[in-house]
């Protein structure tokens, strides 16, 4: 896990450094439709009624976002965040689908803060499928590093939370009070 995190952080740093010249040539402009996607690594921590202490686990993450521009500092869109881990024949998947607002405090900067609300889900597959859906939210930050007129490399940090509630296996309740949260770091591409 530490090796993957180091590689990802190093790659993000190099991408930002390599894009410095391109960034100076391509100023920040936010207009119209935008879409982005990326991948990363994150730590998930679940809890539930009667489960005792569940450990945090590292896994791969991904995101997809798209939307429209409301102003030079405010974007509105939808975002899907997912975390997955496969180990010993068991695959766990956690995710959020959110309506999100992206706020750029300085018009000339690529730095942004985001927040959103929506749905959260959990799924575990190990022969039988355990799953549940509830409410969730996402918060995060990032930086659009312009590498072309309409393209940015976008390092991000995300936190997403879900209050899933009941987890069911074949229609029968297996766990109650399920909650989950994920912290992740990723690197994406955004098309403006």
Regions from the PLM with identified roles:
Residues 19, 41-42, 167-168:
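Amphipathic alpha-helical interaction segments
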Residues 52, 167-176:
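Solvent-exposed loop segments that connect transmembrane elements
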Residues 48-55:
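Hydrophobic transmembrane alpha-helices
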């Amino acid at each position: 896990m530490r090796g993957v995190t180091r590689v990802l952080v190093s790659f993000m740093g190099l991408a930002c450094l390599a894009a410095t010249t391109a960034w100076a040539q391509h100023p920040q402009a936010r207009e119209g439709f935008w879409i982005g996607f990326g991948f990363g690594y994150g730590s998930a921590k679940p809890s539930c009624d009667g489960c005792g202490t569940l450990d945090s686990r590292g896994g791969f993450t991904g995101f997809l976002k798209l939307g429209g521009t409301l102003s030079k500092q405010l974007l509105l869109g939808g975002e899907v965040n997912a975390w997955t881990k496969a180990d010993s024949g068991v695959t766990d998947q956690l995710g959020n689908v959110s309506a999100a607002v992206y706020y750029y405090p300085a018009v000339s900067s690529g730095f942004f803060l985001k927040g959103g609300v929506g749905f959260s889900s959990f799924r575990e597959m190990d022969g039988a499928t355990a799953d549940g859906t509830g409410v969730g939210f996402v918060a995060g930050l990032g930086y659009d590093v312009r590498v072309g007129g309409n393209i940015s490399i976008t390092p991000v940090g995300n936190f997403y939370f879900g209050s899933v509630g009941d987890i069911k296996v074949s229609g029968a309740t297996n766990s109650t009070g399920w909650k989950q949260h994920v912290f992740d770091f990723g690197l994406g591409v955004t098309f403006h």
